[in-house]
């Protein structure tokens, strides 16, 4: 989401419209390092199925929707995560930050958020509207920040509706 926003703001001519999933163009102070730690805690040496990794993630306190989402990034045969957890951890400050950028993206933009998420707050809307004057907002019920993992069918339906309009 943040990379797509930066692209849209720096090169608005490259995009006709934009969908941003539960993130605002602001720096955040909470990290996802605990999720990385949970993934690192999984003993991959004896894993033969994703469900076994999901069980270990559950023991680390990872909620079911994220267990499924994270285990999609598991190379079971290779006994490794496809994600570079070291780089994600090392770059967390950049991941949770947002660069100083100028410009606007005037084209239609959907900010799709989870109703139970606190990532896109009402106080972010003036900034969002100043950078993305064509912004519209929609919320997925019963979804948090990881809305595509929490409610994949509802997420897909909202995206399709927006793109088909």
Show the residue positions of the predicted features.
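Conserved serine/cysteine hydrolase catalytic core
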Residues: 77-131, 136-139
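Conserved acidic functional residues
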Residues: 21-22, 84, 150
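Conserved alpha/beta-hydrolase catalytic His-Asp/Glu region
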Residues: 44-101
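Catalytic active-site module of serine/aspartate enzymes centered on a nucleophile-bearing elbow/loop
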Residues: 134-165
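Flexible "cap/lid" loop of the alpha/beta hydrolase fold
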Residues: 5-50
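Short, well-ordered alpha-helices that flank and scaffold nucleotide-derived cofactor binding pockets
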Residues: 6-13, 126, 130, 157, ...
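Active-site micro-motifs of SAM-dependent methyltransferase domains
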Residues: 1, 25, 145
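Short glycine-/acidic-enriched loop or helix-start segments at secondary-structure transitions
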Residues: 4-6, 29-30, 121-123, 149
